Amino acid sequence: MISSVKLNLILVLSLSTMHVFWCYPVPSSKVSGKSDYFLILLNSCPTRLDRSKELAFLKPILEKMFVKRSFRNGVGTGMKKTSFQRAKS
């Protein structure tokens, strides 16, 4: 049991640090005129380039969560009924 816990811990740690291995620094010969290695690291990192693609799969789920429920009588739609609308319905 302890070995399976260790294995799970190693698996979780390796998956959580995988983005670090994708962001390897570019050698200075490939970058002309830049000496700041931190900027080179950020420029070579694919996860830093576009965060919208990374979270695109969550967009439909989040949209469904925040859609207000609407009923025929207007409850939940956020609209305020006037006396004419109440008499009409």
Swiss-Prot record:
Where in or outside the cell it occurs: the entry states: Secreted
Q: Does the keyword Secreted apply?
A: yes
Q: What domain of life is recorded for the organism?
A: Eukaryota
Q: Which GO terms describe its biological process?
A: neuropeptide signaling pathway; positive regulation of action potential; positive regulation of circadian sleep/wake cycle, wakefulness; positive regulation of synaptic transmission, GABAergic; positive regulation of synaptic transmission, glutamatergic; synaptic transmission, glutamatergic; visual learning
Look up the signal peptide feature and give its range. 1-23
**Membrane spanning residue stretches:** none
Alphabetical list of Pfam families matching this protein: Neuropeptide_S
CC annotations in GO: extracellular region; synapse
Keywords assigned by UniProt, alphabetized: Cleavage on pair of basic residues, Neuropeptide, Secreted, Signal
Principal location class: secreted
Coiled coil residues, start to end: none
Please list the residues that make up the propeptide: 24-67
Function comment: Modulates arousal and anxiety. May play an important anorexigenic role. Binds to its receptor NPSR1 with nanomolar affinity to increase intracellular calcium concentrations.
PANTHER family, per the entry: NEUROPEPTIDE S
Q: What is this protein called?
A: Neuropeptide S
Taxonomic lineage is: Eukaryota, Metazoa, Chordata, Craniata, Vertebrata
